[in-house]
Amino acid sequence: MASRKEALARRANRVRRHIKSVANGRPRLSVHRSSKNIYAQIIDDVAGKTLASASTLEKDLRGSLKTGADTAAAAAVGKLVAERASKAGVSEVVFDRGAFIYHGRIKALAEAAREGGLTF
């Protein structure tokens, strides 16, 4: 039986393999969640560059949030990354949830990014 770490890595690889097959040159919105914060970045895999990023560790968000580990914080990060993506000229992305299930904070970030103008 695989360890928890191996199972997470296998699930993340499975998701990323699927993303690469459907990307068609679109950048990906990669999301990482820790116990205290949430991070999002839009990555152009063709050029190997990060086009936009946002996290709950940023000073302008930290002051307005009670904690970085709830759905309100995730929604704020989603709106901010969508705003920065539109400034960078990105409107279509592929959502990369990694090994995280589409629920809770991950879902809140994705829905806020959609409301902010990103399509995926």
Curated annotation (Swiss-Prot):
Gene3D superfamilies: 3.30.420.100. GO terms for molecular function: 5S rRNA binding; structural constituent of ribosome. One of its GO terms (biological process) is translation. GO terms for cellular component: cytosolic large ribosomal subunit. Keywords: Ribonucleoprotein, Ribosomal protein, RNA-binding, rRNA-binding. The keyword RNA-binding applies. Belongs to the universal ribosomal protein uL18 family. Part of the 50S ribosomal subunit; part of the 5S rRNA/L5/L18/L25 subcomplex. Contacts the 5S and 23S rRNAs. This is one of the proteins that bind and probably mediate the attachment of the 5S RNA into the large ribosomal subunit, where it forms part of the central protuberance. This is Large ribosomal subunit protein uL18. The gene is rplR.
